[in-house]
C-alpha cells in the first residue's frame, strides 16, 4: 500500500472548495514538493472531479488523466472503441488518443453532454479538462476516486511515475479570454469578428483551433485559441477578443 498524507480534509459546512481541492490545487503542489511525495491527488467538494500533481509539482489535468486511463484499458487488452472529450479538450489530447489507434469525438462542454455522446457511440470513456471523468465500464457517473484509482493502478502495474506516464501526450499552449457582453446583440455574428477568426485559423494552418462560445452561466463570450506556438496563440486570442469586445460595445 501507499503512505497517504491528507490535507483539506476538515469540512465545517462552509469551507467546501475553499483554497483546496481540484479547483485550487496550489497548496497540494507545495505539499507534494515539501513531502517529496510521488504524486498528489485533488478532488473537488462533491468528489466527481479529480486532478493530480506529479513529483515535480506539475499539475496533471483531466485531459491527461483520461489519456492515461485509455492507455490502461489498451494495456489490459480491452476494446474501448474511442474516447469522448469536449470542445475545450486540448488538441494534444485528441492527437495522443488517435496515436493509440482510438477514435476521438468532441461533445459540447458539460458532463451531461459527454455522457450523451458516450451512449450514442457505445463507448465507455469520456471526460473534461476539469477532471470530470466518466468510465461507464466502472460506474455510471463521474467519480473522482474511481478515476484516481484507475490511474494509480496503471502506474503501479507499469512501474512508471506519473510524470513519465503523461510524457506521451504533448499539450498544446491554450489561451482563454473572457469578454463581457454589454448589450443583447451577438458579437459572434460580427463580420469583423468572423474575419479575425478566419485570419487566425489561416495562421494556425491546421495545427491549432479557434473556439468562440457564449458562457452558459455568465454574460460572457469565451475566446479560446490553441496551437503549437505560445506567442502566436496569445497574439491571436487577444486580436479576436479585441474584435469581440468592439462588436459587443457596438451591439
Model-derived segments and spans:
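Catalytic-core signal marking the mid-to-C-terminal active-site face
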Residues: 155-251
Amino acid at each position: 500500500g501507499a503512505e497517504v498524507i491528507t490535507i483539506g480534509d476538515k469540512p465545517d459546512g462552509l469551507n467546501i472548495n475553499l483554497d483546496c481541492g481540484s479547483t485550487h490545487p496550489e497548496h497540494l503542489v507545495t505539499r507534494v514538493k515539501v513531502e517529496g511525495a510521488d504524486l498528489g491527488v485533488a478532488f473537488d467538494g462533491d468528489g466527481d472531479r479529480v486532478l493530480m500533481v506529479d513529483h515535480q509539482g506539475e499539475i496533471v489535468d483531466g485531459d491527461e488523466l483520461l489519456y492515461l486511463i485509455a492507455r490502461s484499458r489498451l494495456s489490459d487488452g480491452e476494446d474501448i472503441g474511442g474516447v469522448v472529450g469536449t470542445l475545450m479538450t486540448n488538441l494534444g489530447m485528441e492527437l495522443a488518443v488517435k496515436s493509440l489507434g482510438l477514435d476521438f469525438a468532441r461533445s459540447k462542454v458539460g458532463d451531461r453532454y459527454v455522457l450523451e455522446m458516450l451512449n450514442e457511440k457505445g463507448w465507455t470513456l469520456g471526460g473534461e479538462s476539469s477532471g470530470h471523468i466518466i468510465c461507464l465500464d466502472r460506474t455510471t457517473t463521474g467519480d473522482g476516486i474511481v478515476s484516481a484509482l484507475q490511474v494509480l493502478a496503471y502506474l503501479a502495474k507499469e512501474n512508471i511515475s506519473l510524470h513519465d506516464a503523461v510524457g506521451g501526450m504533448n499539450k498544446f499552449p491554450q489561451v482563454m479570454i473572457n469578454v463581457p457582453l454589454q448589450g443583447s446583440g451577438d458579437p459572434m455574428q460580427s463580420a469583423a469578428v468572423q474575419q479575425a477568426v478566419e485570419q487566425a485559423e489561416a495562421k494556425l494552418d491546421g495545427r491549432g483551433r479557434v473556439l468562440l462560445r457564449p458562457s452558459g452561466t455568465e454574460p460572457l463570450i469565451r475566446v479560446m485559441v490553441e496551437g503549437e506556438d505560445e506567442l502566436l496563440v496569445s497574439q491571436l486570442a487577444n486580436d479576436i477578443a479585441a474584435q469581440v469586445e468592439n462588436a459587443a460595445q457596438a451591439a
